[in-house]
């Protein structure tokens, strides 16, 4: 016996698999066979269009420095979001060649601060390179440790931002630094339980602004 309750919901196959296209006279029409050559041309054409569209997008480089991997997760999430409108890529600071920095259009920095104002291990090279570009010194005796230097830059960043809130502060000026054409933003992860809160992120933000 086959009992069927009514009303009921019945499963049916997808209509695009079972529908039969009919011509003017009501007779079934034959499906158009697409050859491999035509399909390959269509794929090549669509790839070319996508390449042209991607070439017009602004390139965005996302740099991260981390000790625990949290900043890397944030950086990858940020990259996925920016890929909707930018030609974005993400990489660690120790893998980035600082020589390419002045040719970037948009740089996004995601970094934590390790310990008492120290940069993460994979961010030391990048931070030191920025510091040397901003404050070149041939005398090794005059060079302070990166910890002291980044903390001092971070403290200067706080005083600079507080002074920029004053009415007489002027924002209209023409930048002539080596990174004048680079747009940037820095996002820091840290805890206010430490005296130097997000010191490395603030230092990178300040150095990029001074160089641009």
Curated annotation (Swiss-Prot):
Entry keywords, A to Z: Calmodulin-binding, FAD, Flavoprotein, FMN, Heme, Iron, Metal-binding, NADP, Oxidoreductase
Cofactor(s) the record lists: heme b; FAD; FMN
GO molecular function: calmodulin binding; FMN binding; metal ion binding; nitric-oxide synthase activity
Domain Flavodoxin-like: start-end pairs: 60-212
PROSITE patterns membership: FLAVODOXIN_LIKE
UniProt KW tRNA processing keyword: no
Region (Calmodulin-binding): 30-50
EC category: oxidoreductase
Recorded catalytic activity of this chain's protein: 2 L-arginine + 3 NADPH + 4 O2 + H(+) = 2 L-citrulline + 2 nitric oxide + 3 NADP(+) + 4 H2O
InterPro entries found in the cross-reference section: Flavdoxin-like, Flavodoxin/NO_synth, Flavoprotein-like_sf, NOS
Cofactor note as given: Binds 1 FAD.
Highest taxon, organism lineage: Eukaryota
Positions bound to heme b: 11
UniProt key word Flavoprotein: yes
Residues that bind FMN: 186-212
Family indicated by similarity: Belongs to the NOS family.
Protein role: Produces nitric oxide (NO) which is a messenger molecule with diverse functions throughout the body.
PANTHER family to which the protein is assigned, alphabetical: NITRIC OXIDE SYNTHASE (PTHR43410:SF2), NITRIC OXIDE SYNTHASE OXYGENASE (PTHR43410)
Protein's name in the database: Nitric oxide synthase
Organism classification: Eukaryota, Metazoa, Chordata, Craniata, Vertebrata
């Amino acid at each position: 016996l086959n009992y069927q309750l009514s009303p009921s919901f019945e499963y049916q196959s997808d209509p695009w698999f079972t529908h039969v296209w009919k011509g003017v006279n009501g007779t079934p029409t034959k499906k158009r066979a697409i050859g491999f050559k035509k399909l390959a041309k269509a794929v090549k054409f669509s790839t070319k269009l996508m390449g042209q569209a991607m070439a017009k997008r602004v390139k965005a480089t996302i740099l991260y420095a981390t000790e625990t991997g949290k900043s890397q997760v944030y950086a990858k999430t940020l990259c996925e979001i920016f890929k909707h409108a930018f030609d974005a890529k993400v990489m660690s600071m120790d893998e980035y060649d600082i020589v390419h920095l002045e040719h970037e259009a948009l740089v996004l920095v995601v970094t934590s601060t390790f310990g008492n104002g120290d940069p993460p291990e994979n961010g030391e090279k990048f931070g030191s390179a920025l510091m040397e570009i901003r404050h070149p010194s041939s005398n090794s005796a005059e060079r302070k440790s990166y910890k002291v230097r980044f903390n001092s830059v971070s403290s200067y960043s706080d005083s600079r931002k507080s002074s920029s809130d004053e009415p007489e502060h002027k924002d209209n000026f023409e930048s002539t630094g080596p990174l004048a054409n680079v747009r940037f933003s820095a996002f820091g992860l840290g805890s206010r339980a430490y005296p130097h809160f997000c010191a490395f992120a603030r230092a990178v933000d300040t150095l990029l602004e001074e160089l641009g």
